[in-house]
Amino acid sequence: EAGIRFYNQLIDELLSAGIEPYITLFHWDYPYELYKKGGWMNDESPEWFGEYAKVVAEKFSDRVTHYFTLNEPQCFIGAGFFQGEHAPGLRCPVKDTLLMAHNTLKGHGRAVQALREFGKQPLTVGYAPTSTILYPATKHEEDVEAARKAYFSLPDVENWSWNVSWWSDPVIFGAYPEEGLKKYEAYLPKITDADMKLISEPIDIYGQNIYNGRCIRMGQDGKPEEVKRPAGAQTTAMDWPVTPQCLYWGPKFLQERYHKPIYITENGLSCRDVVSADGKVHDAGRNDFLANYLAEL
């Protein structure tokens, strides 16, 4: 109840300031009591997520019309339970993480259903994964197609979680990509037609968190290859590459594949900020970053 009260007040304040709020249902903060029951490993977890979405719709949809179900499943499953770099810092077997991923996507489907059923007005519902954008070295057709092919390809099983297609094809097309079904066959959970119908509940918009990318060209062997960045190329305070081109090519490739309105749901950088003598952070680096990225749209 305290959480609902807080968000009710926040929504009202945003609206009073002329700001349209968007709600993301899940941005990695899993309830501990449900985590102790297995979290996304538990086959009941999609139902739990649907019940939660029902409450959100009942409490907030009189004022909020735009919703994203999940934020960056590649991170909260991959980095959280596979690489062990994010909370809860586990390194689970491949088979377990693929089951978690499947339940996560089923939870997305249950949330879409709940938002549609219990929304107090027509709602705009989306999904917000992330990726490292692969952009072409030139606008020549062979480089563009090399970048596109590499972007939607599936990594080998030891790095399976960081990709586009495994997380998005089921949501849009109602099927996992064949390349992944072959590569990950020995580790897959049971996947039913009913599961895929649930996962592919129709959405209205597709979000993408875009920060940076890698440059790709067609190699002499006819396969995509990465073009290495020159020494001294610009990076952020977190040592992420600054690649404005990704804000053009990422949405372009995603829209051409999935045919949904593309929302850039996150973008930005960490800076080495300093307080100037006048007591202000003038933020020239961030201003420059945003101007260069936005110029690519």
Question: Where on the chain are the PLM-derived regions?
Answer:
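Active-site region of glycoside hydrolase catalytic domains
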Residues: 5-296
